[in-house]
Amino acid sequence: MSMMLRMTIGLAAVLALVSVVRAGDQGEPEPSCDGNTFQMVECLKAKTAQWDKRLNVAYQKAVQDAQPAQRDQLRAAQRLWVQYRDANCLYYGMGEGTIARLDAGECMRSMTEARAKELEGLGHQ
């Protein structure tokens, strides 16, 4: 198989995967976080709370669906992931100026979103 054909097939597979993932993201549109710093931080907290609920549902389903030997490992991995996320985002929050609060909030939102999507995908592998 030629290199160009392999690249085309690979790109098509990636695009198909992205479109499937995006289709699963439909639901409540996320609010826009425009405004002053306080409003933006509060908005990021609200978005994070939405993703955290979705994460908790996905985690409970993943634990329920996991093989018995996998459950303890999944629980341990989730505890360590929460510790990592919190420490990682705290780093951003310790920066200077009001932008640090926004960086920390976006860190929490984006990492929580990514983990929720990862756990939701466990049953589709």
Model-found features: residue ranges?
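N-terminal alpha-helical modules
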Residues: 20-125
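Bacterial N-terminal signal peptides that target proteins for export
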Residues: 1-11
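Hydrophobic h-region of N-terminal signal peptides that target proteins for export
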Residues: 13-21
